[in-house]
From Swiss-Prot:
Alphabetical list of PANTHER family matching this protein: PYRIDOXINE-5'-PHOSPHATE OXIDASE, PYRIDOXINE-5-PHOSPHATE OXIDASE
Protein name in UniProt: Pyridoxine/pyridoxamine 5'-phosphate oxidase
Keyword Cell membrane on entry: no
Function: Catalyzes the oxidation of either pyridoxine 5'-phosphate (PNP) or pyridoxamine 5'-phosphate (PMP) into pyridoxal 5'-phosphate (PLP).
A Pfam family this chain is assigned to: PNP_phzG_C
EC number: 1.4.3.5
GO molecular function list: FMN binding; pyridoxamine phosphate oxidase activity
Domain of life from the UniProt record: Bacteria
Positions with a binding annotation for FMN: R64, V65, L66, L67, L68, K69, F79, T80, K86, Q108, Q143, S144, W188, R198
A Gene Ontology BP annotation from the UniProt entry: pyridoxine biosynthetic process
Bilayer-crossing regions: none
Binding site for substrate: R9, R10, D11, Y12, K69, Y126, R130, S134, R194, L195, H196
Keywords noted in UniProt: Flavoprotein, FMN, Oxidoreductase, Pyridoxine biosynthesis
Species name: Pseudomonas putida (strain ATCC 700007 / DSM 6899 / JCM 31910 / BCRC 17059 / LMG 24140 / F1)
Length: 215
């Protein structure tokens, strides 16, 4: 390592976040920031990439990067194998947190709330627009299970291709979407000298309360 970790830092001076810029509810601001990220972030950064944190039945946290695939007034939607590690964790503890980080904009959004499965119709609608290889992979991969090697996975894919050689694959019951219903959304804008702007929205009795947090 050529540079000390203690010396690795950058100052954030691109923008600020004032209450006057922020609407009374968080979804409009998220849409605005997400649109900015789509326009500004460059490959390999994916604007809809997020870290999803879950907690298992023993209270141990787990996190991984996923892609956001849906957003409406209800919440934030992602898709996965229901039998995967994250699926089992959400079964045991249906609360999760998401973090979006857009480095070019010096922005971060943190979201916390309860997670519930979307309808089978919603899962199928998204499944059908995925590339064929991804649809077959949802059937082939025993996600999060221990396998002997890459060859085993490739064999499972070949078997799945043969199974659906004469028909289009349909959405498996073990695969589908989750929607995080937000109870808290924090917008973070990097500022100079680590005096960042943090606007936090909390859902209280069905209404969003906006407040500023110290950096």
């Amino acid at each position: 390592m050529t540079q000390s970790l203690a010396d690795m830092r950058r100052d954030y001076t691109r923008d600020g976040l004032a209450e006057a810029q922020a609407p009374g509810e968080p979804f409009a601001l998220f849409h605005q920031w997400f649109a900015d990220a789509v326009k500004t972030e460059q490959v390999p950064v994916e604007a809809n990439a997020m870290t999803l944190a879950t907690v298992d039945g023993e209270g141990r946290p787990h996190c991984r990067v996923l892609l956001l695939k849906g957003l409406d007034e209800q919440g934030f939607t992602f898709f996965t194998n229901y039998d995967s590690a994250k699926g089992q964790q959400l079964q045991a503890n249906p609360f999760a947190a998401m973090t979006f980080f857009w480095p070019a904009l010096e922005r971060q959004v943190r979201i916390e709330g309860r997670v519930q499965k979307v309808t089978a119709q919603e899962s199928d609608a998204y499944y059908q627009v995925r590339p064929l290889g991804s649809r077959l992979g949802a059937w082939a991969s025993p996600q999060s299970r221990v396998i002997a090697g890459r060859e085993e996975l490739e064999g499972l894919v070949k078997a799945t291709e043969a199974r659906f050689s004469d028909t289009q694959p349909h959405c498996p019951e073990h695969w589908g979407g989750y929607r995080l219903l937000p109870e808290r959304i924090e917008f973070w804008q990097g500022r100079a000298s680590r005096l960042h702007d943090r606007l936090n929205y909390r859902l209280v009795d069905g209404q969003w309360l906006r407040e500023r947090l110290a950096p």
